[in-house]
Amino acid sequence: MLRTLRSIFVIAISMHLLTGCILINGPTEYANETNAPSINYLPIGIPFVLGGHGSSVPLTEDLSLTAKHVAKLDYSTVVAYHPSCDVAIIKEDNRNKRLAPLGRVSANDNVKTYGIGFSGKAIVGEGKYYLDVNFVDSSLFANCPASIMDAPIQSGMSGGGTFNEKGELVGIISGMSGSGFKLLDGRELGNERTSVFVSTLHIKDWIADSIENYYGLDMDTLIADVPSLTGDFFTNKTPTFNPHP
């Protein structure tokens, strides 16, 4: 399940809600599961019918990150909803799963998108990250920066992950548009497609608070015990978000 985003930053693009339909904005391929990050399948409604599923990314042995709009329809137990971004933390059994560390991404960096495809297998798309913007006409991103990339995604990948070249989780997939778009000042990004994720760096304080509350432990203790929770990610200051107009 994947939602598209409607914004005044996007010009002359037909938008569709992706509830009960199948949309693809570019080529993906099956992931090499021997070295790909672990991605979980989340059934929504009737599995494999009309895109009736989402994805999640293991965070700890007990918790995963996914899209909020997926978590609201999935059968998993929700630990926390982000108050303004399309992200949620849910309970899942992630023992023996590969836990990708959380990380950062910079403009023009190469990224990969991972999620569960129509066949129930993990798929991957490749592209680059451009910038963060405000989608002022979107309920999902009215108060949350939208990170723009051109890596392809499709229905079912919502809640899956965006990863940098180091294999670090830099965002949770939220939505798509089929074409590039212009900023309000008329500049064109030159992107063939528009895929959107929520940056893990932007929500790192919420992630830390949610994990601490769940385990009843402070972050320093958790960092020492959980490979995906690194001091480099959680202790460095989060940069101020300056959305492009």
Residue spans for each PLM region:
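Bacterial N-terminal signal peptides that target proteins for export
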Residues: 1-9
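C-terminal cap/linker of serine protease catalytic domains
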Residues: 24-31, 97-98, 174-245
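A conserved glycine-rich beta-strand in the N-terminal activation segment of trypsin-fold
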Residues: 35-67, 71-81
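Extracytoplasmic
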Residues: 51-53, 61, 73, 83-87, ...
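Terminal peptide-recognition signature
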Residues: 56, 62, 66, 90, ...
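Flexible, gly/ser-rich surface segments that form the specificity/activation loops bordering the active-site cleft
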Residues: 97-158, 173-184
